[in-house]
Each structure stands twice: as structure tokens, then as C-alpha cells.
């Protein structure tokens, strides 16, 4: 048996999102190497790291596995519209898949419909052309996976967009499917339910984020190998911001040091339910007239026009939030600066009095862990998977996402009692230690080994 496992990752969202297309890069730099070396480009100008929980978990995990000599430098195959085909960066070999101009929006519509139904937002319309584009995308990924098969011992496939990969790959190599969104098939259409269950059953093993989702997997009739692993983060990557950075951040967002700051870190998407926090803010605004609601984040890979899928849902939701804030007369208290870098995100956590995770339904949400790393109290919707880690009145609060008044009451409690909030944040930090990447490395390595040995 090899001392190092050869891993190939497959996800829809790429680790790198290019702001310039391949031909724009050629025009700017002349001849590019093949594979293209990311060190030859400029971060923030030519490319950026894709935001989101999936990519922020995968990359640190791969780095740690390489450092510990558990795996060889892996391949990562993902969807990269107009991106260079082969990219080399650090411990990664990136391969980008493209869809043509006709198929890309069709693929996007199908996977968005599937996403909405799986998040209980209503039944999807099955359009044959959209399904064909979705299947084409999965087949293009499978073809690239076959191409790197001689350098692969194990495929590690991420999230629902890749659901057909296990069926397409078949018995060629062990394949683990990491499902990141809620696995609750009880209230979806039989057609979609069967589609999900049949395809999930084609993988050698499935990993879900929460106990809720593991129970949902079993309840749906899945009989294969299944694991539950809470999402994780690298605790050591977070550094305390300097006073100068903090002052500059406050000044840029026009927040006073005396203001009470309620923060949500999430992409601008209806499923993140920022509207509940706006309603809660209106409920407490007379008691805390200087309170600010800080909504950090912009669109996802799906909504990005540069290097993404250009779906309009992010802009539509942002417009609704701004309109709702105006309707409730709290528009001057709601701050939406868009995407911010990790170093600014650490500053945002540091100035916050409370972190809210209001999602009506969500797979997990790493914001809960990140807030605890910064010793901040959290208020988490019972619809978010991370609520499983919240012990009421110890490391935070939970609330019913159908009751924004409960959210408002719990925000008020924390703002009124800052000493209790500090104690909650300290307890939260102890909880966050359980989600450190070093623990995850051991668990993931064990899952890899068990799956390989079963073959």
C-alpha cells in the first residue's frame, strides 16, 4: 500500500475565481505557462479566492494533509467559466471545466431549482434542456476525473451539484461524496427524492455535516456507508487586528466605538434570511437607537458576473433587503459593505457585540464557529445545522426562524447584559476548539482509510 494517498477533489465552486478570462490574461501577460503558475498573476486584480464554506474548508484540509505526508499534491477539478484550463498553485493542481454559452445558464437554472427544492423553497420544474446541461457538466467532470485516474487512489467529491459523479465514475476508483447542504427529503417531490437517493447510493461513502442530516439520510432509505463530520476551520489563521486596522475599519463603515454592532456574515441570498435580522432590529431600535446591523458578504459563485455563473439572485435579494429596511425605517442602521477580505473579517468580528445566524434552513454555517473563535456570543436559527453545537444560555442562544420577535428579544438580552455576553463568548471559544482543522484531519484520514480498505 502507498504511504501517501493520491486524492482528486471535485467541486462546482473553484478554489480560485478568475476576474479576467483566459484570453484577457494572455493579452495582458503574453504567453502563459502550461500549467499556468498562479504566482505569475496578481491576487485581487487577476483572481481572488472563492468565498464560501466549501472552498474555505477544502483548501486548509488539503494543505494539512500534504504537510503531514498523508496525501500527495492533489488535483482539484471544478467549474471555471473562461478560466485557464490548468493552474498550479502551492500544493494544488487545478483543472477548470467550461460549459458553452448555451449550456451554462441552462445548467445554472437546473441546479438552482434543485437547490431551492432541497432547501424547501418549493418544487422545481424539470426542464429537459436544463437537465441535459446539468448532466453534461457532470459528464465533463467525470471525463477529467477519468483522465487523472492513473494518478488517483480516491475521489473526494463535494456537494449536490456533483451528484451524478458517483454513477458516472462507477467502480473505477473509490469515491466519497461530501454533502454540505441539508439532507431532508421528507417534504420534497417523489421525482426529486428518487433522483437524489439513487445517485447518492452510487458513491462508496457519504459524509454529511450534522446529526440531523445523518438521520435524514437514513430516513430517506440510504443503506450505504455514511459518516457525520461537523465543518471545521483553522483556528490559528485568525489574528487579532491592530488598533489602527480597527479604527480604519470603523471609520470606513461610519460606525462609532459606542455603537452596538449586530453582525451577520453570509452571502447575499434569500436562504440566509437577513430579513429576519432587519425585522428584529426594527423591534429594538427605540431601546438601542445607535445599534447597527452589519450585513457582510456579497453574492456566491453562482451570482458572480466575473468568473461565476452570473445568476441574478444576489442582486434581487439585496434590493429586497434594502427596500425592507426602508419600509421598517431602519435603513440608516443597516450597513451592507459587500465582500470583505479575511483580515477585515477578523476586524468585523472583533467590533461586534453579537453574531447572528438567521438562516431558515442551512447545512451548517461556519460563522458560528468563527464567532466563537473571536469569543463572541451567537444567536443561531434552529434551521442552521450549527445550532446543534449551541447550548442555550451557555455559549449562545437559538431561536425559531419563524419567529423574528424571539430573535429580537435575544439580541436585546445580549445588548443589555454585556457581561453575560462575554461569558457566552468564552464558552463558545471552548466549543470552537472541537472544530479545529487538526481534529478534522484525523477524522477525514480515518474516513479515507476505511473507504479504501472496503475496496
Placement of each model-derived feature along the sequence:
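A short helix/loop element that forms part of the nucleotide-sugar donor recognition site in Leloir-type
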Residues: 239-255
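Conserved donor-binding/catalytic core segment of Leloir-type glycosyltransferases
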Residues: 256-272, 278-281, 294-296
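Nucleotide-activated donor-binding/catalytic signature segment of Leloir-type glycosyltransferases, i.e.
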Residues: 305-340
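Short alpha-helical donor nucleotide-sugar binding micro-motif in glycosyltransferases
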Residues: 347-352
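Aromatic "clamp/platform" in nucleotide-sugar-dependent glycosyltransferases that forms part
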Residues: 360
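Short hydrophobic beta-strand element within catalytic cores of glycosyltransferases
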Residues: 368, 377-380
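Conserved acidic donor-binding segment of nucleotide-sugar-dependent glycosyltransferases
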Residues: 392-393, 397-404, 413-418
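A short, well-ordered alpha-helix in the C-terminal region of glycosyltransferases
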Residues: 406, 413, 420-434, 446
Amino acid at each position: 500500500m502507498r504511504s501517501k494517498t493520491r486524492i482528486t477533489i471535485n467541486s462546482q465552486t473553484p478554489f480560485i475565481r478568475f476576474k479576467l478570462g483566459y484570453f484577457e490574461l494572455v493579452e495582458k501577460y503574453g504567453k502563459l505557462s502550461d500549467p499556468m503558475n498562479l504566482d505569475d498573476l496578481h491576487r485581487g486584480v487577476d483572481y481572488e479566492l472563492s468565498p464560501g464554506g466549501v472552498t474555505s474548508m477544502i483548501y486548509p484540509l488539503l494543505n494539512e494533509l500534504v504537510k503531514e505526508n498523508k496525501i500527495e499534491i492533489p488535483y482539484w477539478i471544478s467549474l471555471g467559466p473562461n478560466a485557464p484550463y490548468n493552474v498550479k498553485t502551492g500544493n494544488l493542481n487545478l483543472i477548470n471545466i467550461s460549459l458553452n454559452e448555451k449550456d451554462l445558464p441552462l445548467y445554472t437554472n437546473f441546479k438552482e431549482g434543485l437547490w431551492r427544492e432541497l432547501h424547501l423553497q418549493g418544487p422545481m420544474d424539470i426542464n429537459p434542456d436544463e437537465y441535459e446541461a446539468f448532466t453534461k457538466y457532470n459528464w465533463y467532470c467525470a471525463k477529467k476525473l477519468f483522465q487523472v485516474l492513473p494518478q488517483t487512489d480516491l475521489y473526494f467529491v463535494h456537494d449536490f451539484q456533483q451528484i451524478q459523479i458517483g454513477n458516472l465514475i462507477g467502480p473505477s476508483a473509490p469515491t466519497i461524496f461530501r454533502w454540505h447542504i441539508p439532507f431532508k427529503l421528507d417534504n420534497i417531490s417523489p421525482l426529486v427524492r428518487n433522483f437524489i437517493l439513487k445517485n447518492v447510493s452510487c458513491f462508496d461513502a457519504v459524509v454529511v455535516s450534522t446529526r440531523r442530516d445523518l438521520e435524514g439520510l437514513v430516513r430517506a432509505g440510504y443503506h450505504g456507508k455514511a459518516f457525520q463530520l461537523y465543518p471545521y476551520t483553522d483556528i490559528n489563521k485568525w489574528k487579532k487586528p491592530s488598533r489602527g486596522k480597527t479604527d480604519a475599519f470603523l471609520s470606513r463603515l461610519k460606525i462609532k466605538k459606542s455603537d452596538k454592532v449586530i453582525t451577520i456574515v453570509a452571502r447575499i441570498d434569500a436562504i440566509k434570511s437577513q430579513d429576519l435580522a432587519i425585522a428584529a432590529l426594527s423591534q429594538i431600535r427605540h431601546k438601542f437607537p445607535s445599534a447597527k446591523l452589519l450585513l457582510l458578504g456579497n453574492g456566491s459563485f453562482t451570482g458572480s458576473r466575473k468568473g461565476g455563473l452570473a445568476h441574478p439572485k444576489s442582486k434581487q435579494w439585496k434590493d429586497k433587503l434594502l427596500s425592507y429596511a426602508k419600509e421598517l425605517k431602519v435603513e440608516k442602521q443597516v450597513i451592507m459593505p459587500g465582500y470583505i477580505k479575511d483580515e477585515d473579517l477578523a476586524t468585523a468580528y472583533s467590533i461586534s457585540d453579537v453574531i447572528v445566524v438567521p438562516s431558515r434552513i442551512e447545512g451548517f454555517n461556519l460563522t458560528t464557529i468563527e464567532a466563537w473563535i473571536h469569543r463572541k456570543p451567537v444567536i443561531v436559527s434552529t434551521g442552521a445545522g450549527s445550532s446543534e453545537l449551541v447550548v442555550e444560555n451557555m455559549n449562545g442562544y437559538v431561536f425559531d426562524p419563524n419567529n423574528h420577535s424571539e430573535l429580537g428579544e435575544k439580541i436585546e438580552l445580549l445588548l443589555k447584559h454585556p457581561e453575560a455576553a462575554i461569558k457566552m463568548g468564552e464558552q463558545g471559544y471552548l466549543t470552537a476548539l472541537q472544530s479545529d482543522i487538526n481534529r478534522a484531519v484525523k477524522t477525514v484520514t480515518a474516513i479515507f482509510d476505511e473507504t479504501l480498505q472496503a475496496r
